[in-house]
Regions:
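Alpha-helix N-cap/helix-start capping motif
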Residues: 17-18, 39, 81, 95, ...
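NAD(P)-dependent Rossmann-like dehydrogenase/reductase catalytic/cofactor-binding core
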Residues: 124-173
């Protein structure tokens, strides 16, 4: 639809997952500046994590312009194109996994008698605070996990159950 209206100095920004820069270049009859991006849904609340990658026609200033736009709804990093599909799994799709985890924690709290709205607040805040600890302390997530686990405690028991049930392998797959 935009093929006939874009000029060679226009930066075309794509959020289409799985569509490579070369494929997008083939859609146009003239060489254009194309930036491939992958935002995620936390951008809706200003906490998105997006990646950007420009084609050979893009200057670093072109790519930085797109980064500044995307910074308006979260953080942005420049990546090589072969990393964009990796970003889909680790950032683009992962909010759904986190929502499932929050829901499961809240369901467990509800099963123990906590009102659902309160359970969601506790579970979501725990995830938010934990994420901030990873980002702000610079400590390895395993080290932070170990800080919560005490010998023969309820947390290490819960970690054992999560390991037995295959949390890591499910995420890794």
């Amino acid at each position: 639809e935009i093929r006939d209206v874009v000029s060679e100095d226009t930066i075309v920004v794509s959020i289409a997952p799985g569509k490579k820069l070369a494929w997008m270049e083939g859609l146009f009859e003239k060489p254009l500046k194309i930036v491939r991006t992958m935002p995620n849904t936390p951008a809706l609340v200003g906490e998105g994590m997006s990646c950007v990658c420009g084609n050979e026609k893009c200057s670093s200033e072109d790519v930085n312009t797109v980064c500044r736009i995307f910074a308006g709804f979260g953080k942005t990093e420049i990546v090589e194109e072969d990393m964009i599909d990796v970003v889909v799994g680790v950032s683009g799709s992962s909010p759904a996994y986190v929502f499932m985890f929050i829901e499961a924690m809240a369901d467990a709290a509800v099963a123990d008698g906590m009102p659902r709205a309160q359970a969601y607040r506790f579970a979501a805040q725990a995830v938010l605070g934990s994420a901030k600890m990873v980002l702000e302390t610079g400590k390895h997530p395993g080290e932070l996990k170990d800080m919560v686990c005490s010998p023969k405690g309820t947390t290490i028991e819960a970690v054992r159950v999560l390991e037995e049930k295959g949390l890591r392998s499910a995420v890794f797959e």
